[in-house]
Structure formats: structure tokens, C-alpha cells
A protein has these predicted regions:
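Residue-level marker of beta-strand positions
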Residues: 13, 32-33, 57, 123, ...
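N-terminal Rossmann-fold NAD(P) dinucleotide-binding loop
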Residues: 11, 133-134
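Glycine-rich, N-terminal phosphate-binding loop of Rossmann-like dinucleotide-binding domains
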Residues: 38, 104, 194
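Adenosine-nucleotide cofactor-binding segment
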Residues: 89, 126-129, 137-202
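Glycine-rich beta-strand-centered segment in the early N-terminal region that forms part
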Residues: 1-43, 48-54, 61-64
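Helix-to-beta-strand junctions that scaffold the AdoMet/dcAdoMet cofactor pocket
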Residues: 207-208
């Protein structure tokens, strides 16, 4: 069982600028921005490392060069295609750092919905109104969900989700009764994008 000893350095969804490259690196260069550099360097004394991308300095890999040279990495075993699927990628010119940071989260949103079995005709209930809930809402619609309902408690965020994801219904749980508004409705999938045991119990009532 993995345990975390505090204080620890977090960070696995970050952005970094390459300062130095090794002699066998061919497809990355100093000055390139990359997503998700890995915190594989020794942290400051007194700290442990949990992903550690916020360590100030981190590492990335020239995966294409490694594959061409026959170099293996334990990380590759988790990927169908190391070159296409490796999370640390060069950021295109013109893409902002905040947008680049969201790329890994968006991939996880899409993967989660696929794993949950969301498909054309699904009914999806999402609790949360932050960036993750927005991504889930967009991808649920993209996958063909016939009903996407979002429950949150920030009117401006819910309005943004309604505008961008074209969801069927948004509810503010602070001012509206979720049970009353959704009475009699059932959903194939319920996703807690806020992180609350109470939400899990509440959402389970609406599952088919």
C-alpha cells in the first residue's frame, strides 16, 4: 500500500520549459514548453515527493527518440502507443500555459466516460461545476448522451457549462431542490466531479 509522508511536493499536471537536453535527445530542444514534466529529481531536504512536478525542476523524455533507439521505460507499459499516448508533450506555439495544463485532465475526462460506458443514448448526471465538470459535460455530449444534467452551486459556472456543453439542465443545489427537480428521472451514469461522499450517496438514488 502506497503511503504519503508529509510535507510532500505535488504536481503531475504542469507545464515546464526545457533548459537542458541530453546528447541523444533529437526531438526536443531548450526553450520548448512541455506538458506534465515528471518530478523525478531529488526534492529539497525534509520533503518527500508525490509526483513532484512542482519541485521547481523536473524531467521529461524524448519518447520518440527513445522508441527509435530501442530504449525501454516502465512508463511505456501503461501505454498502447508510447509516442502517441505519453502525457508529456511539446506544447504548440500559440497555446497558453493554462490551456496546456488542462490537456491531461481533458484526456482523463474522456477516458473516464468511455470506461463508464457512456455512449449514444446515455443519460448522464454530473455533480460539480468546475473545469472537470465542464470537460465531462462536453465529452458526454460528444459521445452521444441524450441527456446531460449538471448540478453545482455557482450560477456563473453553471451558465458557462450550459453555454459551452449545451447540456439539457443545470441545477444550483444551493437554491433548488435536486430531489424535487429530478423527481422520477433516472440516469445511466452519475459522476461526482466535486469529491464528496454525500454527493455519491445522493447521486446513487438517480441511477437506473
Amino acid at each position: 500500500q502506497n503511503t504519503i509522508t508529509y510535507p510532500t511536493l505535488l504536481g503531475h499536471e504542469g507545464v515546464g520549459v526545457i533548459e537542458q537536453v541530453g546528447e541523444k535527445v533529437r526531438y526536443l530542444k531548450p526553450g520548448d514548453r512541455v506538458t506534465s514534466p515528471l518530478g523525478m529529481l531529488t526534492p529539497a531536504p525534509g520533503y518527500t515527493q508525490t509526483f513532484g512536478g512542482m519541485n521547481g525542476y523536473a524531467l521529461t523524455m524524448d519518447v520518440k527518440a527513445m522508441v527509435e533507439d530501442g530504449v525501454k521505460s516502465p512508463l511505456f507499459g501503461m501505454l498502447d502507443d508510447p509516442i502517441l499516448d505519453f502525457p508529456s508533450r511539446r506544447i504548440p506555439d500559440g497555446m497558453s500555459d493554462p490551456d496546456a495544463v488542462m490537456l491531461l485532465t481533458m484526456k482523463e475526462n474522456y477516458s473516464a466516460l468511455k470506461n463508464f460506458g457512456v455512449h449514444a443514448g446515455s443519460r448522464v448526471l454530473i455533480f460539480g461545476d468546475g473545469a472537470v465538470a465542464l470537460g465531462l459535460s462536453c465529452f458526454a455530449r460528444y459521445l452521444g448522451a441524450v441527456n446531460v444534467t449538471v448540478v453545482g452551486h455557482h450560477d456563473e459556472r453553471l451558465a458557462r457549462i450550459a453555454e459551452l456543453a449545451k447540456v439539457d439542465l443545470t441545477l444550483n443545489s444551493k437554491t433548488e431542490s435536486v430531489e424535487e427537480k429530478l423527481a422520477g428521472q433516472k440516469f445511466d451514469v452519475c459522476v461526482d466531479a466535486a469529491g464528496s461522499p454525500e454527493i455519491v450517496l445522493q447521486g446513487a438514488k438517480f441511477l437506473v
